[in-house]
């Protein structure tokens, strides 16, 4: 089971544990944050080394730009190799259905920078593995039927990982500064995870995780506008769909403990009146999708746990 240090993989790990499935928590690279999360699970672990070619950094020095590589595809291939070598029959990732939807760019159309986290890649790669590598090796995402909000709801059921997890991508930059704390509080991932968790956990707990209330800071307005697809497009980050952000914000606007925060109040006054009320309901976004590669018997056991 791949672990990335964020909420998604921890939801998968605990779901499999509750279903009685033996698992090895696996990560690629040397992140100490991921190691701490993996050790926190108390399960067997596997850390696979991956070293970037020094020529890449030489190209940087010569002026070459860094590009976004399909890192989930790379890691999927590495973990399939590890599974074959170790005689394991399943490789499990934690990509939710929201990953299949990109950013809507004016004049261009949809651009999905996280395509290798989406359903099209999972289906194609999983079929390739079974046709050409090992017929009995299942590759799938355990969270594919779930939206980001459904994953957040599941994560909020336990505080066991509150002091260990982080979805902030600045923790994983190869070059440049990393946040002193686990959450930088200003990137799209921090913005979205805070918003996604807010409807499902006590405010005091969420603020304790992040160290501050991101929704009561007017300087974060531009970042949240992008998540809401208000006068901007969804960021090129692994965040939920615009409709999920809008529904989460509308939910908070109706809650006494959130509605006075400056960005929630701004949403209620400026953005919500332009939206159809029936598109702001959170419940329809928590319904499971039927498109996934999870083995049927396992999904039946997991489904009840996710729905509870």
Which role fits each region the language model picked out?
Residues 1-7:
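Short, glycine-rich nucleotide/cofactor-binding loops
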């Amino acid at each position: 089971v791949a672990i990335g240090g964020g909420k998604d993989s921890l939801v998968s790990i605990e779901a499999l544990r509750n279903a009685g499935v033996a698992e090895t928590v696996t990560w690629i690279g040397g992140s100490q944050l991921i190691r701490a999360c993996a050790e926190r699970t108390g399960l067997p672990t596997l850390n696979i080394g991956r070293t970037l070619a020094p020529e890449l950094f030489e190209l940087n020095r010569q002026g070459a730009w860094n590009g976004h590589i399909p890192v989930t595809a790379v890691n999927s291939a590495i973990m399939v190799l590890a599974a074959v070598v170790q005689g394991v029959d399943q490789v499990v990732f934690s990509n939710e259905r929201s990953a299949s939807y990109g950013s809507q760019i004016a004049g261009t159309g949809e651009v999905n920078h996280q395509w290798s986290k989406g359903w099209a890649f999972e289906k194609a790669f999983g079929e390739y593995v079974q046709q050409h590598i090992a017929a009995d090796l299942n590759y799938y995402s355990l969270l594919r039927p779930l939206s980001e909000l459904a994953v957040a709801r599941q994560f909020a059921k336990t505080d066991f990982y509150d002091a260990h997890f982080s979805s902030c991508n600045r923790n994983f930059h190869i070059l440049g500064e990393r946040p002193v704390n686990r959450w930088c509080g200003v990137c799209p991932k921090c913005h979205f995870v805070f918003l996604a968790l807010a409807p499902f956990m006590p405010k005091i707990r969420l603020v304790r995780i992040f160290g501050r209330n991101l929704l009561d800071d007017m300087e974060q307005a531009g970042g949240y506008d992008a998540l809401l697809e208000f006068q901007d497009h969804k960021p090129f980050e692994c965040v939920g769909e615009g409709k999920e952000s809008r529904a989460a914000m509308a939910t908070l606007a109706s809650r006494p403990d959130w509605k006075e925060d400056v960005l929630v109040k701004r949403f209620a006054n400026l953005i919500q009146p332009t939206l159809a009320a029936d598109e702001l309901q959170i419940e329809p976004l928590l319904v499971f999708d039927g498109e996934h590669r999870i083995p049927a018997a396992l999904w039946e056991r997991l489904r009840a746990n996710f729905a509870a």
